[in-house]
């Protein structure tokens, strides 16, 4: 796992020979982190990488004493249901109504 600090947040990424994932974390207040550009390449799906990304996000949130994770995803995509399965709730439609803001409150 490599970690890179950027001007706007932190980037975590992992490279395998044929695929990779990246997770961008932004924290602009003391109680919420925002995930952006969470990606697992198509051929890597079904191998638990998405679960690992969410574990990393939750670990990083807890490390910062943050209790809420928010993200935005395409509402018509399978990934919307996948996030719900992993404890995220619909929060509100984005200005562009194709996207839904979602949140997960950590224990």
In which residue ranges do the predicted regions lie?
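Acetyl-CoA-dependent GNAT
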Residues: 1-36, 41, 93-97
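Short coil/turn motifs at secondary-structure junctions
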Residues: 28, 43, 76-78
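Residue-level detector of conserved, well-ordered beta-strand and adjacent loop positions
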Residues: 36, 72, 103
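Conserved acetyl-CoA-binding loop-helix of GNAT-fold acetyltransferases
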Residues: 40, 46-59, 85
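Conserved GNAT acetyl-CoA-binding A-motif
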Residues: 61-74
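Conserved beta-strand-loop-alpha-helix junction that forms the acyl-donor binding cleft
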Residues: 71-80, 95-99
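Conserved acetyl-CoA-binding loop of GNAT-fold acetyltransferases
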Residues: 84-93
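Active-site/acyl-donor-binding loops of N-acyltransferases
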Residues: 93-107
């Amino acid at each position: 796992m490599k970690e890179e600090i950027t001007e706007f947040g932190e980037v975590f990424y992992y490279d395998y020979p044929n695929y990779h994932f990246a997770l961008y974390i932004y924290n602009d207040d003391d109680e919420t982190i925002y995930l952006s550009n969470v990606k697992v390449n198509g051929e890597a799906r079904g191998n638990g990488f998405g679960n690992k990304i969410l574990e990393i996000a939750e670990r990083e949130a807890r490390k910062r004493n943050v209790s809420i994770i928010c993200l935005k995803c395409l509402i018509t995509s399978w990934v919307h249901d996948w996030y719900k399965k992993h404890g995220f709730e619909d929060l509100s439609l984005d200005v562009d109504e194709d996207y839904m803001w979602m949140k997960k409150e950590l224990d």
